[in-house]
Amino acid sequence: MIRIDTPENIYAVFMMRNDSPDELDVIPRVLPSQVHGDNIIHIHDDNAMSYVLPERPKADGLLLTTAKVSASIRVADCAPVMIYGEDWVMILHSGFKGTVLNISRKGLELVKRNYGDDSVKEAHAWIGPCIGRDDYERDANEEWSIRGMNEFHRENYDVKDEKVYFDLSGEIESQLIDSGMKSENVTVTGINTYTNHECYSYRRGDVKERMTLYARIKKGLPV
C-alpha cells in the first residue's frame, strides 16, 4: 500500500497487489464503472448517496467535495491520477484512451469552474503506477494509435518498425502542466506495472485483478 502525501484533511492510498480496499470502507464508497472515456462526476453533499455502491455510475473520474462518502477507481496498467487541494480531491482513471482524450485537462477545467483559476495553480497531483513507455507497444496504423500520435507531445512516444511506444505518465504530466499546474507540484511515482510484480498488470496476464486508488475527505472521520 502506498500512502499518498496529502493535506491533513484528505486521506488517500493506493492499494497494490494483495491489498484489500474493503478494509478502508469506514463510510459508503463510490466506485464507478470505468469505460475508458473522459466523463467525470462531481460528488457533493446533495448527490453523494445516490452514487455509492452497489451503484456503479459510468465514469472515469470523480471530483469529491464531501466527507459523506469515499471515492475509488481501479487500474492494472492504466494510470491512476489524483489531483487535490485543501478541501477537495479528484481521482482519474487515465488509460491510453483517457489520456488521448485528455481527461486530466477536463478534470482541471471542472475544478476551475468550482474553485476558480487559482485552485489549479495551487493544486498538487500524483501520478501512480502504470505501464512504462518501453512496455506499452501499439500498432502504429491502428486508429487510436494515430489519434495518440496526434494528441501526445512528441517527446512522449517513440515509433519503431511500425510500432509506437507511448509514455502514459509522461504525457499526463505534460497535460497537467499545460493545464496550469506547477511542475513542482506534480509527483510521478515512476513505477512500471508491467515489470514490477507488486502490481497487477493486464498486459502481463492479470485480466480480472485490479489495484485501487482510494480517497476521502476526513473532517474528523477515523483513519
Predicted regions and their residues:
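Active-site microenvironment for binding and transforming phosphate-containing groups
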Residues: 1-223
